[in-house]
Structures are given as C-alpha cells and as structure tokens.
C-alpha cells in the first residue's frame, strides 16, 4: 500500500513554528534544571528541514475516511535543527561559598563572585529510529506513541566547544534530557499541534486563552519599592538623602536606586561584618532581620556532658521458668570516684519454686548515648585471702528441683559477707543426706501452695559432688538439735552432739520439676551434698577449715532420725 506524505506545509507555516517553539520552551522548563543553569531555556530557532522521515507500514488496524490507526517503522536522518539559549554559572565555586560565612574564605579570592555568561546550544544531525503507533482522527487529531527510545544520535554545538570536558558534559546531559523529552512531552506537543491544524473549534478556544493571558499581564500594577522609603536613606557614598531627592528617583533612574539603604542599618551591617572577621561574639541588633544559628542538637557535633550516674537497681525475670524475681545492681559511675558504692543485692521476691540469684553487673542498663557504657564488677566482701570469688562478675543461678517431691521448708542462713568462698581441688563421693524435718519457726517467709503444704516428707538426696567450697575461720550456723539427724555410732566419738547441717550459701531448693534441667539439678545436688559432708568432716576433725583435702575417706552413712 502506498500513500502520500506531504512535508512542505509544515515547513512553510510560520504560525506553526511559533506555536511549536512556545510548547517546546514550556516543556524544557517544566522539569528541574541543573544548578549550573541560572536562567530559563528558550527555544530560539526551530526548523524541521526539507527531508521528511521515512515511514514503513507494519500493520493497519483501522482505516476509514476520517480515521486511521496503524503501526509504522520510522527512520529520520534529515536536516532539521534546534537552537536553544540560556545563561549558565561559569563559576561553580560561587555556589559552594554562597552558604559559607565570608570570614571563613581567604581574602582576596578571585573566584568568590558569581559569573553568569550566555550559552547558545544548537542541536543538529538528529537521527531517529523507532516503532510508532499512529492514531488519526479529524475530531481528535493525531496521536503518536513511541514504542522504544527513538533517539540514536545527535550533534551538540555550543559556546564552549573549545573546552573539551565542557563539550562532553553538555553532549551527555542534553542527550539524556532529549530522550526524556521525546518519550514524555513530544507526543503531547504533536497532539496539540494537530488539533490546532484540523480542529477549528480548538484553535478558537486556544486563541481566546492566549488573549486573556496577555490582557492579564498588561493589567498587573507594578509594585513601587520606593513607596515607603527608609527614614534615614543614604546614597552610594553614604550621604543622607532628603524626601525630595527620594521622590525624584524612579525604577528607571539608574544604578543609584540600588544603593538606597538605611544609614543605621549600614552601620550595623558593618559592625556585624567586623564581628565575623575578628571572631567577636558581639552581634548588633538589626530591625526586620532574622538571625539564624545552629543549635548543638541540630549540628550534631557537640557531645554533651552529663553528671556521673549513680547505681541503679534493675528487676530482670529469671530465665529458668516461673515468676521468680531477683534484684541485681549495675555500677554506672565514672572513674573519677563520684559514684556511690551499691549495697549487697538480696533476694526479695520468690513467687515460684525456681529462683535465680544473679550477682553480675546488669548488661541491660543503658548509659549516655554518646559514650560507651562501663560495666564494673564490684566485690562486696572484704577479702582476707588471696582467692577471688569470680573473675567474670557473674554468679551461676542455682536452681534445684526434685521430681514428685515436696519442697524443703527450711530457712537457708547466709554466711557473713567478709568471708570469701573458694572451691579447692578434690572430688568426694558419698551416698545420701537425710535432713529430717524442719521446724516451723525456721521456715522461710514465703507463699506456699496447698499442694506443698500437704506434704511433710523430706526428699533423700543422692549426689556426686564436683567442686566443693571452703571457708576459713567460719563456724556453720546451727539449727535446733531436734530438726537434724546425727551420725551413726562409728562417728559419734568425734562428732559433737549438737553439730547440725545447713545448706551452702547461694543454693536454693525447690520441688518444681523442670524436664530441661535434669542434668543441672543432678550436678547441683551433688555439689550440695559434697559441701555438706566436707564441712561436717573438717569441723569434727580439726575444728576449722583446711585448704588441703585428699578426699580419699569414704563418706559416713546417714540414717533417718527415729520418730
């Protein structure tokens, strides 16, 4: 199928060119411009040339007298060109120094002032190749859609062709902007131009809108900046102007009108400039002026100082289950010694049978946001030996449970705080411990469930200890004689009749069964039994704690007290 494509009416219509230039100018200034461009982009000249594009019909979807729809392959390599004019900033350093104080830049500085120069760009040798969808109707005009990027290449000629890197920069930027323009703005421009050519009603409406815009521009009243001049106006040389001289000035009066400032404000500005130059803290007050300053929080460059934080108590929940609660402490005071020494933490609440005691520094506490938090381990006992309680600052949370057995209702006395407890080497085995019944007056003050209150029997513990604990010059606190069992006849000669048993400090017993902690329970029960046997053995043999123990003797046998 063949058709006639007449290009000459477009090239001969002057009104068409004028309207096309206006639309292209509006489209080029719609998108954000680079900061180097300081003025609007004006389309100075537009010429479509004498060579029309080559069109190849690929598909025809609809064909009638007043409408047409088809897909074409377009190729263009003609003599069309486009000339643009604008003003650019030839001194990029001025943009950088615009927001900086004048006293921070070296004086004099040749590149301190702004320099804008005119720029003329000519786009020629445009080569296009694309698949287009054309829909034509006399009522709706011509609609053209590019299915791919049509721009293949073009030549950019500008005022800065003698500078290679500026030429390459302009070539790259203009190609990128032109691709966006052709895909987004060019179809809309072609559609409006087609409506103007084939739709008389659209042309009349557009002419009416343009006439109203011109009339509105003429009716605008210019604002006279000299209607309310300052009271003490001065000229460029600092001479005071009277009212008659001010009235003679006009908007077209020359360069002197730009020097009409208040004399007092000029003096204040000079004082402010001197303060900046000399780094003085004096700031003169100027009316109708706003002083901007950065607060330390906005600048982010000042790390505020805070007073030393005191020790705080935290209440973490136990990780072993239940609702057991312990109080731990964290020393967050600084190194200068202003922090206060915390008191020894004690067990406050026991809401379940599983209770943990933590003596380590709390790692959940947060210090100042700009300084690294300091966790310290505080030894609360006055050490009399060279042994240390712990180097890590964290004590193990002891929890002992016995399956299907009642809870031990006996009070656990604490050892004096000035006696450190250290584990010596050695390993001892023994069979069992019978603790007997605990008197009611020695029971701890805590809530007991009805199931625990109905049980009166004491569990028998069979353990294998691993690391016993020793202490010097420490007498074991005693319970009543009736609440504990005595040794058998083979040890009765060397055992005091009123020697009684107490649990080691820091161990707590419960009857709650935990399936995941059976191994831990067995180990702690072994350790408790070994500690009890060693303390009783050494007290009966030597009367004080010894630092050496071979642990070869078999443990004595225990038997329950006759009821």
Curated annotation (Swiss-Prot):
<keyword id="KW-0812">Transmembrane</keyword>
<dbReference type="InterPro" id="IPR031468">
    <property type="entry name" value="SMP_LBD"/>
</dbReference>
<feature type="region of interest" description="Disordered">
    <location>
        <begin position="298"/>
        <end position="460"/>
    </location>
</feature>
<comment type="subunit">
    <text>Component of the ER-mitochondria encounter structure (ERMES) or MDM complex, composed of mmm1, mdm10, mdm12 and mdm34.</text>
</comment>
<dbReference type="InterPro" id="IPR027536">
    <property type="entry name" value="Mdm34"/>
</dbReference>
<keyword id="KW-1000">Mitochondrion outer membrane</keyword>
<keyword id="KW-0446">Lipid-binding</keyword>
<feature type="compositionally biased region" description="Polar residues">
    <location>
        <begin position="386"/>
        <end position="402"/>
    </location>
</feature>
<comment type="similarity">
    <text>Belongs to the MDM34 family.</text>
</comment>
<comment type="function">
    <text>Component of the ERMES/MDM complex, which serves as a molecular tether to connect the endoplasmic reticulum (ER) and mitochondria. Components of this complex are involved in the control of mitochondrial shape and protein biogenesis, and function in nonvesicular lipid trafficking between the ER and mitochondria. Mdm34 is required for the interaction of the ER-resident membrane protein mmm1 and the outer mitochondrial membrane-resident beta-barrel protein mdm10.</text>
</comment>
<keyword id="KW-0472">Membrane</keyword>
<keyword id="KW-0813">Transport</keyword>
<feature type="domain" description="SMP-LTD">
    <location>
        <begin position="1"/>
        <end position="195"/>
    </location>
</feature>
<keyword id="KW-0445">Lipid transport</keyword>
<feature type="compositionally biased region" description="Polar residues">
    <location>
        <begin position="303"/>
        <end position="332"/>
    </location>
</feature>
<dbReference type="GO" id="GO:0032865">
    <property type="term" value="C:ERMES complex"/>
</dbReference>
<feature type="compositionally biased region" description="Polar residues">
    <location>
        <begin position="444"/>
        <end position="460"/>
    </location>
</feature>
<protein>
    <recommendedName>
        <fullName>Mitochondrial distribution and morphology protein 34</fullName>
    </recommendedName>
</protein>
<dbReference type="GO" id="GO:0008289">
    <property type="term" value="F:lipid binding"/>
</dbReference>
<dbReference type="GO" id="GO:0000002">
    <property type="term" value="P:mitochondrial genome maintenance"/>
</dbReference>
<feature type="compositionally biased region" description="Basic residues">
    <location>
        <begin position="365"/>
        <end position="383"/>
    </location>
</feature>
<keyword id="KW-1134">Transmembrane beta strand</keyword>
<dbReference type="GO" id="GO:0015914">
    <property type="term" value="P:phospholipid transport"/>
</dbReference>
<dbReference type="GO" id="GO:1990456">
    <property type="term" value="P:mitochondrion-endoplasmic reticulum membrane tethering"/>
</dbReference>
<feature type="compositionally biased region" description="Polar residues">
    <location>
        <begin position="346"/>
        <end position="357"/>
    </location>
</feature>
<dbReference type="GO" id="GO:0007005">
    <property type="term" value="P:mitochondrion organization"/>
</dbReference>
<keyword id="KW-0496">Mitochondrion</keyword>
<feature type="region of interest" description="Disordered">
    <location>
        <begin position="535"/>
        <end position="563"/>
    </location>
</feature>
